A protein has these predicted regions:
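Bacterial Sec-dependent N-terminal signal peptides
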Residues: 1-28
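An aromatic- and glycine-enriched ligand-binding surface/loop that stacks and positions planar moieties
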Residues: 20-82, 159-161, 185, 192-196, ...
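Conserved, well-structured interaction surfaces
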Residues: 38-47, 51-55, 76-158, 173-186, ...
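C-terminal substrate/ligand-recognition segments
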Residues: 96, 345-426
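Core alpha/beta catalytic barrel or barrel-like domain that forms the active/cofactor pocket
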Residues: 161-167
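Short edge-strand/loop segments of extracellular domains
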Residues: 167-171, 252
Length: 426
């Protein structure tokens, strides 16, 4: 036990110390004063804070987080994700290092906020000065959102966590005690309330228009998610009614805003990798690559490696098209298990089933099929992943292509579901 405590303290200290320096590659050689004297360097610092936003594109030793649950199974037993299946993981033996990653992100946010200055006199005579300052006015509020988001990610995993808003030296970091869960939640909600009206609904009218930045909608969505989790019996015990009310009101706040300005809406089309989707509130953007496809194209397709394979549990969770639950005791359901005319259409946007068309060829997951056992690395579940996979990417060595990848952090559908859940448990 003492060894575990010391290991956790050491990890925290490493993350929270050395705030006089900046882990930003493009700024190597610059000290703190240099960093916050020039606009582009300060912008780079905020970009660094953004860079810690999560994206589950095979981050877990090639697998997605779903492979740690009953939603999926990883095709290769060499991945560290197996720790979650065989019970060998622990708070200090994980494969994603959330603690270290997010406290590093929080340290970067604290550094930005503690050293933020409202003006850059060295560029005030530049032609684009006003444009830059109109962008810059939102930076501290974006940093505060990001810090609150990272605290939510920590609190939902560890519950009581150290709440730090200043840069600490090593000896100070060693003496920080965890804050009560409710205090962390109150901090996140308070930050959301304070910055909500400071951020724009959209950046379209901001000079130097940039997408992917924090908006009012993202702040409201974080508040909604935070209060919903806080109301859960896992955290609230039996004292949840007032918390469910707060969660419902937070979700309704965003719903009312959407009804007034139409900023977001539910859509039928695919929303991942679709930056134009009206359902997107906030997403993590990754540059052009084909790494996710190399991991998850089915075995039997050029360059395929199977990767994260959805389970029957996940497939069964998709309803029939008439809204009824899939029932193995209902022969009609069994006969129409993979019938797009009878099954929830979201199933076929998420999972490649036997007989699905992928890259203009039928998927064969049955034993002896071109994508099934006994091929080495064939799906262990009978299914392959379709969601987030960019089918048009080519892994042909003579004609390899890439594409952008977008991981959804908040979508409008979640807010509606948050509201429904909170009302149902109010």
């Amino acid at each position: 036990m003492n060894k575990k405590i010391l290991s956790a303290i050491f990890a925290f200290a490493v993350c929270m110390s050395s705030c006089n320096y900046l882990d930003y590659n493009e700024s190597s050689g610059f000290d703190k004063e240099d960093m916050f004297t020039y606009f582009e360097r300060a912008k780079g610092m905020l970009t660094t804070v953004y860079s810690y936003l999560p994206a589950d594109f095979g981050n877990f030793d090639g697998a997605t987080r779903a492979a740690a649950t009953d939603e999926a199974e990883y095709a290769w037993n060499t991945s560290g994700i197996i720790r979650y299946n065989n019970g060998s993981w622990s708070p200090i033996l994980t494969i994603d290092n959330v603690w270290g990653t997010y406290y590093t992100a929080i340290r970067s946010a604290n550094m930005f906020l503690n050293n933020y200055q409202e003006d850059f006199t060295n560029i005030e005579w530049n032609d684009n000065y006003e444009t830059l300052m109109q962008q810059y006015q939102y930076y501290p509020y974006e940093a505060r959102f990001l810090r609150a988001f990272y605290y939510f990610e920590l609190a939902k995993r560890y519950k009581n966590v150290p709440l730090i808003t200043e840069c600490l030296e090593l000896d100070e970091a060693n003496s920080v005690a965890p804050s009560d869960f409710d205090k962390v939640i109150d901090f996140i909600v308070s930050e959301c309330d304070e910055i909500m009206d400071k951020l724009p609904v959209s950046y379209k009218d901001v000079p130097g228009y940039e997408t992917g930045r924090i908006t009012q909608g993202a702040v409201m969505a974080l508040k909604s998610r935070t209060l919903l989790y806080a109301a859960s019996p896992l955290y609230a015990g039996t004292a949840g009614q007032e918390k469910w009310i707060a969660a419902a009101k937070a979700a309704k706040q965003l719903i009312d805003k959407v009804e007034s300005d139409g900023r977001y809406q539910l859509v039928d089309e695919q929303i991942w990798n679709n930056l134009a989707s009206k359902e997107l509130i906030l997403e993590t953007r990754r540059g052009n690559s084909n790494d996710f496809e190399k991991l998850n194209f089915p075995i039997g397709y050029e360059g395929g490696n199977s990767g994260t394979c959805p389970t029957q549990n996940l497939v069964d969770a998709f309803e029939m098209k008439d809204g009824s639950r899939f029932d193995w005791g209902n022969q009609e359901h069994i006969d129409n298990m993979y019938n797009p005319e009878k099954r929830d259409p979201r199933l076929f946007k998420t999972v490649l089933t036997n007989g699905s068309t992928f890259k203009n060829a039928a998927v064969e997951t049955f034993v002896g099929g071109k994508n099934g056992a006994p091929l080495d690395g064939a799906t262990p579940t009978g299914y392959y992943l379709k969601k987030y996979v960019v089918e048009t990417i080519s892994l042909n060595p003579n004609n390899t292509t890439t594409d952008r990848h977008v991981w959804i952090l908040f979508r409008y559908a979640e807010v509606l579901l948050n509201y429904t859940e909170a009302l149902g448990l109010w």
